[in-house]
Each structure stands twice: as structure tokens, then as C-alpha cells.
Regions:
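Function-dense linear segments that define catalytic or interfacial modules
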Residues: 21-28, 57, 281-285
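Anion-binding and metal-coordination hotspots
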Residues: 63, 81-82, 86, 91-552
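Trp/Phe/Arg-rich N-terminal binding region typifying the photolyase-homology
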Residues: 32-46, 52, 56-106
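Basic, low-complexity segments
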Residues: 1-37
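Conserved catalytic core of Hanks-type protein kinase domains
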Residues: 24, 67, 500
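Short secondary-structure boundary/capping segments within folded domains
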Residues: 6, 39-42, 269-270, 378
């Protein structure tokens, strides 16, 4: 399209796609998505270009096809199509996403951008990890709405014969046909209590009716959801037998029946959200996104780290990062961060970070950077096993009211003892899962430092985490000025990349779809679009059979 030549910047995403769309999105790349019978109405390369531009600009399907029809830059990006090239309906995008989701390579658009970056030498051995909230696309439900919606969902998926049997068990005067809250005087505590109790009895009656029946997948899934929402939010009074809303929050609580996988989450202790977490790994030198993952909002930042680093670390990375090292609760003043569980011990030849890691042989090893959320003991153990250079921050232990923190105690893992600031030594009592506890007990009663150490009449107890040694080495490494300099120069780069991903609210910060699998696919496509935009700034071009970036 000659009109765009000279008007569209070659370093823009439109310029990159115009030059490279045929190399990136060849017909062969999508051949497995289509049969040989019939005729495709829209070439898959054009659909892929529209999907990428849709994500980078935060558009709905209808807005995207409209933009393709009337924005010359979009047709220029799709290989220089004439302005009168016919458009297509938005369902073509829906169909392409469905085909990709059913395929063996649902994230192939992201994969091809990463492969091009690797071929151009833009992906080194460093990785920076971070996460960001992704707000869900559904409304958070209260307990009454959750239970009623789950009952309604079960009745909807049951066949006519089973539905008749289920409805015969219902006690409330409610046909469960409409969505939303049931009619009730919510200002009347007695009426509210009767409503909750009635919903509970209806729910348990339906579950009892299904007991020992052979259920189809849809009914089984709906029954499981109903059992979950009733069990998580209600308690039965032992005295009068009435079901009431529990005065607690269940672990891993379901917050919507429309999207049962979304969760309450906290990016920080003061900032909560409802939805998912998007996790990324980037190369800090080129700022290319190398991996993405999506988890429920209540998952820890370090939980998917092994998956983010799977292509970069030797071995299978099978260690469960979610099995983090956390001190036992008690008077020891544990930090809420999972990394705060470890403490003193002798550093060995596995020292992490520091100036020794800048040696020439160290540059051939992977390096992983992350904030304190990635200072979990299990992740540190995985990185040590992979001989990676570790630049993930570990929080120091804390204690309430300025008392002695755990780092004031001498933990000797080799001798399995702990010595307190008053030079009293006690053995570590091992725990089944690793680690253990050191109980000072009676020694604290006459200790002159007791008031500065504990307020418990039972004395001080020190919890020894399963990954005590790894956390000890990590804390020792981050005291090195060279480690601090490298960390401060490298880790913040991921924040800018998060900003690029979240630039648009629709499809960026706010999910466009429901369910973790679909949100993950959408997040991966967004990362591919951001990578393509980065290609323009790096001057990435196809050079014969290879890819090359412009000289720095």
C-alpha cells in the first residue's frame, strides 16, 4: 500500500508486521488447524496480524475487524493489502482462538516471536521474574448469590428426568429460573437467616439426591461446584441446627460461579483484587518476554517460577516451588513473606550472587532476578541445583516490638543446635517434612535478656525451615555490594515491561475472557504483541534464512 510508505514508521509494530508478517505467520504454521476440505475465507496470516494488533491496542473483536476494514495501517501491516481489500466478520477471530485452544500448540504466535528473538541473538542467560494482577471479567458474588447460582446451574445442566427428581427435593418457594439474588428483606436479620438456611437445605437436598448416581461430566462438575460453595461459606449451628454464614474465610474460596477459577488475591498486604495473576520472565538486556504463565489470584508469585524458567534451567525443574519454606507460627516474630523463614548458618561454596559471579565462567550460567516474593526457599533450592546465579531478594527475619529477631540466634545446622544471645544452646527437634524447632523453654525463665527476647511464659521457640541453608546463603550473598549493584541495575527493567503489558485496560489489566486457560492464552498473545513492538525498537529483520537485529 503506497499510501503508508514513508508515513508509517519502520520501527512501529505496523512497520515490523509489514516487513515480516509472511516470515512470522506462514500458512504452514497454521496448517494443522484446518482440514484440506473446503476453502478458508480469510488467510490465517491476516487473522494472526489482526489478533496481534487487537491485543496491542486493547480492542474487542468487533472493534478489531472494524479497524482492519477502515484503518490503512492495519492493512499495511497485513502485508500491504489494498485499501479496498474486503474485511471479515468478528466470528473469524472467535473461530481462530477456538482452533488454537484445541491444538497442540495454543501459544504458537508467542512461540514464533520468541524463536525469532533467539535466532537474532537477543535472548541471553539472564531472566527477571515478576507478576501483575489481572482483574477478572465477572462480578464477585456474595454467599447468597453464590449458592443460589450454583443450585440454578445444577438444575440447568440436568436432563429433564433428573431435573424433575431434583426439583421434587426443593423446599424453598423458588423456581431458580432467574439469575441474581432472591427476594428478601435484607434489612431484617431474621429474614436473612431464614433465606440462608433455606438455600442450604435446598443445596444439600440436591446433593443427597445425586449421591451414588452415575453422573455425566456436566452434572458432576455442577454438583462439585455446589458442594464447594456450600461447604466453604456455611456452618451449621450445633444447638438449633440452623445453617448460618461462617465467620471465617475459607482457603481457596470460590468467588463466582460464572468463572469458578477466579480468586481473591493480594499483590501487597494493602492492595487486594479479584481475578488472576499474570507472570512473566524477561531478558533484561533486550527486554524480550521469554515466558508467561497465569495463575489464580491467590497463588504466590514464586509458584509458577519453575514453569517460567523451564526452558532456561537444566534438568526437569520438578521441584514444587509452591512448597515454600515458612517458619512455624509463634513468638519468633516471623515475617509474612515466605522467604523470612530461614536464618543463620555457615555459607558454603554455593554462595549466591556477589562479585564471584561476575567471573567469566559465571556468565555462562543462567541468572535469575526477582523481588522478595521470589525469595522462597524451594525456588532457591531449584536455582542452586541448576547452578544458576541467584539475584532474588530474601527478606530478613523480624520480631514484634523490637525483640531479638531470629538472626540474633546462632543456628548450626551441622551440629543441629541453636544458640541464643545469652549463649544457651539447645538441640533442634527435627520435623517430618524437614527442618524442625528449637525450644528454649525453661532456660528463658531466669534469663536476663528474656524481656528483650519473648513475652511468652513458655519461653522462646525458634522454627528451623526446610530450606534453612538455602535462605542463609541467599541472605549472605545479598550483603555483598556487588550483588546489590547488579540487582538494582537489572531487576527494575521488568517493571517497565509490566507497564507495556498493562497499557490498555481492556484485555490488559482487565481480562477479556473467563477461565484460567483462556486468560492464559490471551496473556500469551498480549506478550507476543509486546515482543513484536519491541522488535521494531531493536531493528529486528529477516536476513535470508536467519534473523538479525540492528547494531547497538
Amino acid at each position: 500500500m503506497s499510501f503508508c510508505e514513508g508515513r508509517v514508521a519502520p520501527e512501529s509494530i505496523y512497520g515490523v508486521l509489514h516487513r515480516e508478517c509472511f516470515s512470522l505467520f506462514s500458512d504452514e504454521m497454521f496448517a494443522d488447524l484446518f482440514t484440506d476440505v473446503g476453502r478458508r475465507s480469510v488467510p490465517p496470516m491476516i487473522v494472526a496480524v489482526v489478533m496481534v494488533l487487537q491485543r496491542i491496542e486493547g480492542l474487542s473483536d468487533r472493534e478489531a475487524v472494524e479497524r482492519f476494514a477502515f484503518d490503512a495501517r492495519w492493512k499495511y501491516a497485513a502485508g500491504g493489502l489494498d485499501f479496498d481489500y474486503p474485511g471479515f466478520v468478528h466470528t473469524v477471530l472467535v473461530d481462530m482462538r477456538a482452533r488454537l485452544a484445541r491444538s497442540d500448540r495454543p501459544d504458537r504466535i508467542f512461540e514464533v516471536t520468541l524463536a525469532a528473538a533467539r535466532a537474532a541473538g537477543l535472548v541471553g542467560r539472564k531472566r527477571v521474574l515478576d507478576s501483575t494482577p489481572l482483574y477478572d471479567a465477572v462480578a464477585t458474588m456474595d454467599t447468597v448469590t453464590l449458592i443460589r447460582s450454583a443450585i440454578r446451574g445444577l438444575l440447568q445442566v440436568a436432563d429433564s428426568a433428573l431435573e424433575a427428581k431434583l426439583r421434587a427435593r426443593l423446599r424453598r418457594d423458588d423456581d431458580y429460573a432467574s439469575a441474581g439474588k432472591p427476594v428478601c428483606d435484607y434489612d431484617d436479620p431474621v429474614a436473612r437467616e431464614a433465606l440462608v438456611d433455606g438455600l442450604a437445605w435446598d443445596a444439600y437436598a440436591l446433593l443427597a439426591c445425586l449421591d451414588e448416581r452415575e453422573l455425566g461430566p456436566a452434572v458432576d462438575k455442577a454438583a462439585e461446584l455446589l458442594a464447594t460453595v456450600v461447604g466453604q461459606d456455611l456452618d451449621r449451628d450445633a444447638g438449633d441446627g440452623v445453617f448460618r454464614i461462617a465467620r471465617r474465610v475459607a482457603k481457596d474460596r470460590v468467588i463466582s460461579t460464572v468463572d469458578p477459577q477466579t480468586r481473591h488475591g493480594h499483590k501487597t498486604s494493602a492492595r487486594g483484587f479479584d481475578g488472576y495473576k499474570g507472570h512473566i520472565a524477561i531478558d533484561p538486556d533486550s527486554e524480550i518476554i521469554t515466558a508467561t504463565e497465569v495463575t489464580a489470584g491467590n497463588a504466590g508469585d514464586a509458584d509458577p517460577a519453575a514453569d517460567l524458567l523451564a526452558a532456561d534451567l537444566p534438568g526437569d525443574g520438578a521441584q514444587d516451588i509452591g512448597d515454600r519454606d515458612v517458619d512455624e507460627p509463634g513468638d519468633s516474630g516471623n515475617h509474612p513473606n515466605p522467604a523470612a523463614g530461614g536464618d543463620t548458618g555457615d555459607s558454603d561454596d554455593k554462595a549466591l550472587g556477589g562479585a564471584d559471579q561476575d567471573a567469566s565462567d559465571g556468565q555462562d550460567r543462567p541468572a535469575v532476578y526477582g523481588d522478595a516474593a521470589y525469595g522462597a526457599g524451594a525456588l532457591l533450592a531449584t536455582l542452586e541445583a541448576a547452578h544458576a546465579r541467584i539475584f532474588t531478594k530474601v527478606q530478613p527475619p523480624t520480631a514484634p516490638d523490637g525483640r531479638f529477631a531470629k538472626d540474633r540466634f546462632d543456628v548450626d545446622l551441622a551440629a543441629s543446635t541453636v544458640t541464643c544471645p545469652n549463649a544457651v544452646t539447645v538441640p533442634i527437634r527435627p520435623a517430618k517434612g524437614g527442618g524442625g524447632t528449637a525450644v528454649f523453654g525453661p532456660a528463658c525463665a531466669k534469663c536476663p535478656l528474656a524481656t528483650r527476647c519473648t513475652s511468652s511464659t513458655a519461653g522462646r521457640t525458634i522454627a528451623i525451615g526446610r530450606y534453612e541453608a538455602e535462605l542463609t546463603r541467599a541472605r549472605a550473598a545479598q550483603d555483598d555490594p556487588a550483588w546489590v549493584t547488579e540487582y538494582r541495575a537489572t531487576r527494575p527493567k521488568v517493571e517497565r515491561k509490566i507497564g507495556h503489558l498493562m497499557r490498555r485496560r481492556h484485555g490488559g489489566r482487565r481480562a477479556r475472557v473467563r477461565g484460567r486457560t483462556k486468560v492464559a492464552a490471551d496473556f500469551s498473545l498480549l506478550a507476543a504483541a509486546v515482543n513484536l513492538a519491541r522488535f521494531g525498537m531493536l531493528g529486528l529483520r529477516r536476513a535470508g534464512a536467519n534473523w538479525a537485529a540492528a547494531p547497538a
